[in-house]
């Protein structure tokens, strides 16, 4: 993204990491403005003393993401998020996805958290390194299945399969549903496999971001941490 301006908390530019950011901006010719705590809070409650004014988030196409995997010579490893609402959950999953080498993340056009300052912050900047696409999920799933990609949806129903039966190798897409309702019916029916994580406690389910992160790591491990 193009950075237009950096806003730094007044009196903080001489301290640690913020001083490094200030000096880097000077070298790059980026405008730096001192602002009050109140102004930074109005931009993002968790600003850590600095905020950037940038161009809009550069969403990618489905084909951009497939090309990304192809250029790396790797089987596609994708993440579909079906109507996830919480910015913290989206940020957490973007962070995990970037760490384990997911080639792209897919969001629906509506009824979802999108890439906002809160999500960028929650992802610890991983959103800036991850290819994200907004699509019609059901249509995209059908298209990608025709290209040989298998879809595994996280589910808590009794009909869902156990971990031992799932093959995470090869072209793969993991689907994580919304916090309250899970996957929508059409998306759920489109999955090749439904996966239920084993649990031994009294709580019925895991947080969506936690469950998704666990399976992303398990898939990465199965793929040889490559």
Q: Which role does the model predict for each range below?
A:
Residues 99, 121-126, 185-226:
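Structured adenosyl-cofactor binding patch, chiefly the S-adenosyl-L-methionine
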Residues 103-160:
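Histidine/lysine/aspartate-rich catalytic loop segments that bind and position anionic ligands
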Residues 36, 82, 108-109, 136, ...:
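Short beta->alpha connector loops at strand-helix junctions that form conserved
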Residues 1-71:
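N-terminal positively charged helical leader segments and presequences
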Residues 85-92, 207-211:
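Amphipathic alpha-helical repeat scaffolds
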């Amino acid at each position: 993204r193009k950075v237009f301006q950096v806003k730094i908390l007044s009196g903080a530019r001489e301290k640690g990491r913020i001083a490094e950011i200030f000096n880097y901006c000077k070298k790059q010719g980026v405008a730096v403005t001192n602002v009050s705590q109140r102004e930074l809070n109005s931009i993002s409650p968790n600003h850590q003393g600095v905020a950037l004014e940038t161009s809009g988030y550069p969403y990618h196409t489905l084909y951009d993401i497939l090309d990304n995997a192809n250029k790396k010579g790797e089987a596609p490893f994708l993440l579909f998020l079906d109507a996830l609402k919480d910015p913290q959950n989206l940020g957490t999953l973007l962070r995990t996805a970037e760490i384990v080498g997911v080639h792209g993340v897919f969001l629906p056009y509506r009824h979802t958290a999108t890439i906002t300052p809160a999500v960028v912050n929650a992802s610890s900047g991983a959103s800036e390194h991850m290819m994200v696409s907004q699509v019609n999920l059901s249509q995209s799933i059908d298209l990608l299945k025709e290209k040989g990609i298998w879809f595994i949806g996280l589910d808590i129903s009794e009909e869902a399969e156990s971990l031992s039966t799932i093959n995470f190798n090869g072209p793969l897409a993991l689907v994580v549903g919304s916090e309250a309702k899970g996957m929508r019916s059409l998306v759920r029916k489109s999955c090749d496999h439904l996966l239920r994580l084993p649990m031994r406690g009294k709580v019925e389910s895991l947080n969506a971001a936690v469950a998704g992160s666990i399976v992303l790591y398990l898939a990465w491990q199965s793929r040889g941490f490559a």
